[in-house]
Regions:
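Sec-dependent N-terminal signal peptides
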Residues: 2-14
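Carbohydrate-interacting regions of secretory-pathway proteins
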Residues: 16-249
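N-terminal export leaders
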Residues: 1-2, 223
Length: 249
């Protein structure tokens, strides 16, 4: 993950209710738990014992953050989440949500870490998170992802067996893009954001929103809809059974 600053507000939604936003950040991150994966071998981690080979290196795990990957700063009187990106992982709400409107604002920092020194900065909003931490690449829970990456905010990624239906079209056999009005297709791999896209330059604040209701979700960037997913669900590894995924952390 490569996000520097992140402001979070959440609202629960009802069929005929106006949203009431609830701040999700405080200085102690009291509404969240941390999970961190395997630190890159290019730097030392206090108190961390590596395995005999890179594949045997253990995860840092739950609420163990010796490098302060996740901290809160106060900017203009408001708590702002600072993520260094030095270790892949996630910050997960303690509470589960089903129907909600999540509104975030973020801007990028300048520093990068191995293994992404030459890659674009990358993060994501993962929602409907269920199951065990680390199910996806030792870093994330099973979930749906709204990608927050430089140049690709609003792409959809499935984590640990998640899948959806979406209105998409193929581009050049390489890109599957969200296209409003296109036929729905069952998807288990990346869906690129739509062409109505307006990301702000690095260093400026972008507003990213996720609306989730009854298993569907809408991703918006700076007031524009960039992706829509339908019928959130998942499959266990090796199974063809599809299980509804409408709520989670």
């Amino acid at each position: 993950m490569r996000l520097l600053s992140f402001c979070l507000l959440g609202a629960t939604l009802g069929a005929a209710e106006a949203p009431v936003f609830t701040p999700l950040l405080d200085a102690q991150l009291s509404q969240w738990e941390k999970w961190l994966g395997v630190p890159h071998r290019s730097y030392e981690v206090p108190g961390y014992v590596r395995g005999a080979t890179p594949k045997e290196d253990p995860v840092l795990g739950l609420n163990r953050d010796p490098l302060d990957v996740f901290t809160v700063k106060v900017i203009d009187g408001e708590p702002v989440l600072n993520i260094t990106g030095q270790v892949f992982g996630g910050l997960t709400t303690l509470k589960s949500f089903e129907n909600f409107h999540l509104r975030t604002q973020h801007r990028w920092g300048t520093r990068k870490w191995e293994p992404r020194l030459t890659a674009v900065r990358d993060n994501g909003i993962l929602f409907h998170c269920i199951g065990e931490h680390g199910a996806g690449g030792k870093n994330w829970m099973r979930s749906q992802e709204c990608q927050v990456q430089e140049g690709d905010i609003g792409d959809w990624w499935p984590i640990a067996g998640a899948m959806v239906d979406a209105a998409v079209k193929d581009e050049d056999g390489k890109v599957v893009r969200y296209v409003p009005g296109a036929p729905l297709r069952a998807m288990r791999s990346r869906i690129w954001h739509g062409t109505d896209y307006a990301e702000k330059p690095s260093g400026e604040w972008n507003t990213v929103e996720v609306y989730a209701f009854a298993g569907d979700a809408v991703f918006r960037l700076n007031g524009r809809t960039v992706n829509v997913i339908r019928h959130s669900r998942y499959r266990e590894k090796g199974s063809e059974q599809e299980i509804s995924l409408k709520a989670g952390k």
